[in-house]
């Protein structure tokens, strides 16, 4: 529990913490095939960020900005503190999780052992003009009135965006 909210997470293995941070809008399910491979190397911790996966959701009444970076980061930092993640941390992060992980590392530099990331947010995107041209349409769609249906009902992010973002065949 973080405050009154439940943060769901998977924890497997023993040893130094390996923190898996998913992107938006996904969950710890993203790491389902990675966790078994890493659990022999340390204690793998894969939380569902607040509002995603099996973690509690914030009240709709709090408005459309209830999941700002600051809010999500605070829940993540408080969660890590609550479960005792403090030293020799390896962060493995994807997408939105990279921004959260990088910031946690900046705030806790003596706690970091290593960082690995993919599809990271490494610089600000101030406007749609800063986005890759072929991504603008779909991501604007996710932010439209149809966005919830596209993501939750049609699973377009997981089934469409992620697989189509791979630039080469995976081995």
What are these regions (language model features)?
Residues 36, 47-50:
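N-terminal cap/lid subdomain of alpha/beta-hydrolase-fold enzymes
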Residues 4-10, 17, 30-31, 45, ...:
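Flexible "cap/lid" subdomain of the alpha/beta-hydrolase fold that forms the substrate-access gate
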Residues 24-35:
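The serine-hydrolase catalytic nucleophile loop
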Residues 16-22:
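Short beta-strand element of the alpha/beta-hydrolase
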Residues 40-44:
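A generic structural motif
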């Amino acid at each position: 529990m973080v405050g009154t909210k439940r943060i769901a997470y998977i924890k497997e293995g023993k040893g130094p913490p390996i923190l898996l941070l998913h992107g938006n809008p996904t969950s710890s399910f993203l790491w389902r095939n990675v966790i078994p491979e890493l659990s022999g190397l340390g204690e793998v911790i894969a939380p569902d960020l607040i509002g995603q996966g099996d973690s509690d959701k914030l009240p709709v009444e709090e408005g459309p900005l209830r999941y700002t970076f600051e809010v999500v980061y605070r829940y993540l930092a408080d969660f890590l503190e609550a479960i005792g993640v403090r030293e020799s941390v390896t962060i493995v992060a994807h997408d939105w999780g990279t921004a959260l992980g990088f910031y946690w590392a900046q705030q806790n530099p003596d706690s970091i052992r290593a960082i690995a990331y993919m599809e990271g947010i490494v610089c600000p995107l101030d406007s749609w003009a800063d986005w890759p041209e072929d991504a603008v349409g779909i991501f604007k769609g996710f932010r439209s009135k149809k966005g919830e249906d596209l993501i939750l009902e049609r699973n377009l992010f997981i089934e469409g965006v992620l697989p189509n973002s791979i630039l080469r065949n995976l081995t």
